[in-house]
Amino acid sequence: MSYSPTLSSGFTAGRNSNRFISPPSGMCSFCSEDCNGTCEIALAAVLGARTVYPITTGNNQIASEKDYPLDYSHFNINGRVFGAEGTDKGLEELTVFDVKLNTEYGSKNKIQMNLPIILPALIKLNWRDYFGGAAMSGVSCVIGEDARNNDPNLVMNNGKITEFPLLQEIMDSYYPYHRGFGQLILQCNADDNFVGVPEIAIKKYGYKAIEIKFGQGAKGVQPLKRLKNLEMAIEKQAMGCLVHPDPSDPKIKEAYENGACPSFYSCGRFPVWTEENIKIHIEDLREMGAENIYFKMAGYDEADLERVLRMACANEIDMVTFDGAGGGSGYSPSKMMNEWSYPTIMLEQKVVQICKQIKKEGLLLPAITITGGFASEDQVFKALALGEGYITSVGLCRAAMAAAMTGQKIGAQIKEGKIPPIFQAFGKTVEEIYSDLPDLCAIYGKQALDFSTGAIGVFSYLHKIGFGVQHFGALNRKFDVSLFHTEDLIPLTLEAEKLMPLK
């Protein structure tokens, strides 16, 4: 049995020409010279190296297609009929609504959230409603790396950013709905640091939280982007980007003019952190005015996982997000999305084991988020339970953006009188059909009726996630999210049982 996809994919546009497949290679078992060329090999034969990355990126998001042999579906959720933990209420008074989902984190500056949910780094598609919906839901959310590349009004002088109006636009999409729960966080990679993104974000635009990026589950290296011509290569280099080959080299210019120059690529810088230089960087961020510092880490080698956690402990980092394989991205190498990193469930187990060792040493651990392929409340509950109290929140990125996009699109259809058939039984207007609008009105008053339906979509989706988690908490007679544990899970396979702690 092969766990990897064939040479067909939803995001490479490749298609095997028939249904008979050779599992080891993913090729058609019968490969003919009469084939019109639709598979990934045919694409590579014509488009070459650019097919390392998806050729379909744009107004979409993409994710791993590998069918991993172990995931959260290998567990069922336990249930109990006796007792009640985490509440002072009498048993005869308790309902599902009594399960407390609110959490708090932060080493120096405490952040409260209404849900054990984080919306991880993103800065494409319907980002306004993604961030606005996060604020309405009372959860923290992260602006993705390289946001500067999305700002047509960006201004740079002497290699440093002096104007970054997109940062203000993002704040304006978040803070009108913010009511004291959650935080808006700006993720910065090595290139962002190089051109001064943290400095201008904190000093000019008033950002209070920075996430330092080590990596993400869909790509363990920074992306390479093909550039159309010499002019674009020179422009990117002037903005501080690494460009290959070097467009300022006279020999490269001459080769380009003669039509004999290889393709240009902008190359993201690798993070080069040590215990010493990251300490200085964090101190600098705090001196600038940052109140909370976060880490974003992928499923790298186990020694690297431990090293990052120890860096977090040593520098009083507020939260570390670990991103496993199986999630998605806006732009990552196709095979890297499928074929690298610990799958999220295995990454979570590794992180928990490391946390146990660090805790034995008496060190204070940061809050920890696990993300990578989560979309429903059963998955969120299982991740929190398997985290044994060390995992304090779950990241929902692609799913929350899907809610922002569909919430916006369906709202527009309703306003045009083109109600999708599935929703026609629920009413004729946005107010009638969007069922959680009364909950938003209870918070913001009737002005919520005028909110963007994309942001309402994110709020409604996260409301559903929280409500579903409350059901599973009540099912196990645990009325506080902090009490969820592995005893609340039933392993269905031997592989799943091996992930459970020894009793």
List PLM regions with ranges.
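Cysteine-cluster motifs in flexible loop/terminal segments that predominantly coordinate metals
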Residues: 17-50, 361, 406-407, 412, ...
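Structured core elements
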Residues: 118, 142, 185-187, 211-213, ...
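Conserved, well-structured core domains of diverse proteins
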Residues: 1-115, 124-135, 139-140, 152-179, ...
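Terminal peptide-recognition signature
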Residues: 134, 320, 480
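A structural-propensity feature for long, helix-poor, extended segments
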Residues: 101-104, 152-191, 415-449
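Active-site-facing alpha/beta catalytic cores
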Residues: 121, 128-312
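Short histidine
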Residues: 400-503
